[in-house]
UniProtKB/Swiss-Prot annotation:
Described function: Catalyzes the phosphorylation of pseudouridine to pseudouridine 5'-phosphate (PsiMP). Catalyzes the first step in a pseudouridine degradation pathway. Acts together with the pseudouridine 5'-phosphate glycosidase PUMY in the peroxisome to prevent toxic pseudouridine monophosphate accumulation.
Gene Ontology CC terms, in alphabetical order: peroxisome
Pfam family, one: PfkB
PROSITE patterns found in the cross-reference section: PFKB_KINASES_1
Outcome of substituting K166A: Reduces kinase activity 6-fold
Annotated protein name in UniProt: Pseudouridine kinase
EC number(s) recorded for this UniProt protein: 2.7.1.83
Self-association and partners: Forms homodimers.
Length: 378
């Protein structure tokens, strides 16, 4: 079976001003509708990279749902639709640099209707999945139900934090989670939630100018909290500074994916040929519960907007893992997919050109460098 994705399908309303937004009045620009929601974006990205995920979510029987489903090509079996459900909508106002300046999210339907009972109907899909990804739009009860079903069959779980506030829902499920993918602020919020004290403070804007090594040192205590609470892999997204891959020991062995039955499709063939797994073969000797950390760079992009980048990083990584690549190769594909996302007007590009993705993944992979290996976590 292919990966299972559980979470939000949302209609995004994007307001893109031609000039700097002014409080209290309107400015000229474009207002566009775009399919969105972390889980939906991840599933769409995976599908466009040649893997067919199974999506579990909820939608209304209304106009916004019809817009969302217009280009939907995946199974509808896992998507609950009822007349009393209002399809989730998020309205975003961008600044002239393509970053979100303000937004309002009306996504209560995800928590109210995507219940443990609905999720448990798809026990077979989850128990036989390559990997389960859940987004933090789910209620705590729904997250626990999803993770327990996966744990019963040793299916790896990827937790996508969604936002600073919702990222704290990691507290009740950390022991089930294999991978998390926070940005710096979400990482701090998750660490505080797990240690039940506000020991860590939000990253200051001037700290983004630190060297990668200094940035890692600043984030390391929070990363260790997650790893010591059961999470096996922490991928910290750093925006234009790339991403950190941190794990207990060898990250290639962190996921319990049976590689005998992986499909080895087009993504695998193209990336395996340019991203040699032997480049990091020395990791194979690491059997101790030590801290591993690696930095992955970004590559130059013609940025149109930044929403969707993190979702495509996750989607590209999950698709690659499902196709047989190791975690380091897969994250390189994820970062290449994120680049394609920021160069698109949509949250997920209409298509991914695999020659460009594999070429960009090669650049990321060859630029990756280890920051720490074989140091005790104690």
């Amino acid at each position: 079976m292919e990966p299972v994705i559980i979470g939000a399908l949302i209609l995004d309303v994007h307001a893109k001003p031609s000039t700097t937004p002014i409080s209290g009045t309107t400015v000229p620009g474009q207002v566009l509708f775009a399919p969105g929601g972390v889980a939906r974006n991840v599933a769409d990205c995976i599908f466009k990279l040649g893997i067919t995920p199974f999506m579990i979510g909820t939608l209304g029987l209304d106009g916004p749902a019809n817009v969302l489903l217009k280009e939907w090509k995946l199974s509808m079996k896992g998507i609950l639709r009822r007349e009393d459900i209002s399809t989730p909508i998020v309205s975003l106002v961008y600044d002239t640099n393509g970053e979100v300046a303000a937004g309002v999210a009306g996504v209560d339907a995800v928590e109210n209707f995507l219940t443990p009972e609905w999720i448990q109907r798809f026990e077979y899909n989850i128990s036989s999945a390559r990997l389960l990804m859940v987004d933090a739009n789910l209620s705590s009860l729904a997250l626990e139900a999803s993770c327990k079903l996966a744990a019963e069959s040793s299916v790896p779980v990827w937790f996508e934090p969604v936002s600073v506030t919702k990222s704290q829902r990691i507290a009740s499920i950390a022991k089930y989670v294999t991978i998390v993918s926070p940005n710096q602020d979400e990482l701090i919020a998750m660490a505080n939630a797990l240690c039940a004290k506000n020991l860590f403070h939000p990253f200051r804007s001037d700290e983004n100018k630190l060297s990668i090594e200094d940035m890692f040192r600043a984030l390391k205590p929070a990363i260790l909290v997650l790893l010591k609470n059961g999470v096996k892999v922490v991928i910290v997204t750093l925006g234009s500074n790339g991403a950190l891959l941190c794990s207990k020991g060898n990250p290639k062995k962190a996921l319990n994916i049976d590689r005998k039955f992986l499909r080895s499709g087009e993504v695998f063939k193209r990336v395996q040929s340019v991203c040699s797994p032997n480049r990091f073969s020395e990791l194979g000797s690491n059997r101790s519960p030590s801290l591993f950390a690696m930095h992955f760079p970004t590559i130059p992009a013609k940025v149109k907007k930044l929403t969707g980048a993190g979702d495509c990083l996750v989607g590209g990584t999950v698709a690659s893992l499902s196709d047989g690549l190791d975690l380091i190769q897969s994250l390189a594909v994820g970062i290449a997919s994120a680049k394609a996302a920021v160069e698109s007007d949509d949250n997920v590009p209409p298509e991914f050109k695999l020659d460009l993705i594999s070429g960009d993944a090669e650049l990321v992979y060859n630029g990756a460098k280890m920051l720490m290996v074989h140091q005790s976590m104690l």
